[in-house]
């Protein structure tokens, strides 16, 4: 048993979609979350800069004595997960492999779509993982650079969001039966995405799939939280406005949280 918290990092608020699922599946675990909102979105940035920013968040989480780190950001996973995993002596999870595996199990037609940030799509990480596991699966990828700014500005239910999602995803409609939400921000737009793609298309939330892997690793390494130890509580950090982060986070997590601003 291990009562240390699990560390989560993201370029902004998107990683909260993973945290929400962890609260549901693993309510006994404690969370330290950092969102680098001041420098979001990561998708258009050069790979080396994304790697540098991700390491800054990792090093911050290590000062909090976390027992595991979850890179709850597809862009950071695509660019930095392998390197970080190899250099740390605690488990490090990314969100790409769990999403790819779930998509393969989901598709009946062998036609999978991936939507993500420009860097995630450019990295080709999802397609490589899917075709390594299922060579006959057809994969189409689409960058959606306007989605993250909509979420970060808390406009998920706006007419702008509906317009942008419709215009962006129209080329994919009718061409696949499974769509990976390849950015942890995108589940916050899920109702609109589902409406555009059609009810028959299965949406894969890579973050939710990742929580299943978290549970497996907690059991494997025997580092589940000890209920007998007093909780230290959850802690949330942002590099931007705590007020803006708190507003979106409480709306999404359906609970009050405390947020601190930090400088990396």
Curated annotation (Swiss-Prot):
Active site (catalytic residues): 73 (proton donor/acceptor), 183 (proton donor/acceptor)
Binding site for substrate: 10-11, 42-43, 74-75, 184-185
Keywords recorded for this protein, A-Z: Cell shape, Cell wall biogenesis/degradation, Isomerase, Peptidoglycan synthesis
Enzyme class (EC, first level): isomerase
GO molecular function: glutamate racemase activity
Role, per record: Provides the (R)-glutamate required for cell wall biosynthesis.
Listed name of the protein: Glutamate racemase
Origin species: Streptococcus agalactiae serotype V (strain ATCC BAA-611 / 2603 V/R)
């Amino acid at each position: 048993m291990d009562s240390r918290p699990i560390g989560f990092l993201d370029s902004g608020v998107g990683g909260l979609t993973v945290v929400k699922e962890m609260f549901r599946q693993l309510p006994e675990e404690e969370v330290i979350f950092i969102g680098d909102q001041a420098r979001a979105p990561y998708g258009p940035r050069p790979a080396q800069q994304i790697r540098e920013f991700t390491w800054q968040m990792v090093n911050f989480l290590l000062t909090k004595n976390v027992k595991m780190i979850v890179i709850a950001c597809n862009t950071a996973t695509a660019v930095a997960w392998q390197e970080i995993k190899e250099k740390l002596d605690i488990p490090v999870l990314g969100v790409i492999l769990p999403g790819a595996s779930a998509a393969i199990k989901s598709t009946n037609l062998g036609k999978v779509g991936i939507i993500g940030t420009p860097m995630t799509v450019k990295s080709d990480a999802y397609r490589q993982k899917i075709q390594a596991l299922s060579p006959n699966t057809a994969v189409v990828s689409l960058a959606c650079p306007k989605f993250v700014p909509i979420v970060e500005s808390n406009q998920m239910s706006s007419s702008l969001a509906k317009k942008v999602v419709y215009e962006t995803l129209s080329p994919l409609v009718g061409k696949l039966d499974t769509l990976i939400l390849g950015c942890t921000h995108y589940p916050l737009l899920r109702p609109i995405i589902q409406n555009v793609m059609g009810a028959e298309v299965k949406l894969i939330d890579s973050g939710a799939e990742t929580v299943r892997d978290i549970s497996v690793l907690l059991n494997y390494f025997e580092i589940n939280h000890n209920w007998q130890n007093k909780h230290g509580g959850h802690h949330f950090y942002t590099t931007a406005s705590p007020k803006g982060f708190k507003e979106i986070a409480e709306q999404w997590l359906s609970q009050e949280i405390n947020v601190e601003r930090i400088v990396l």
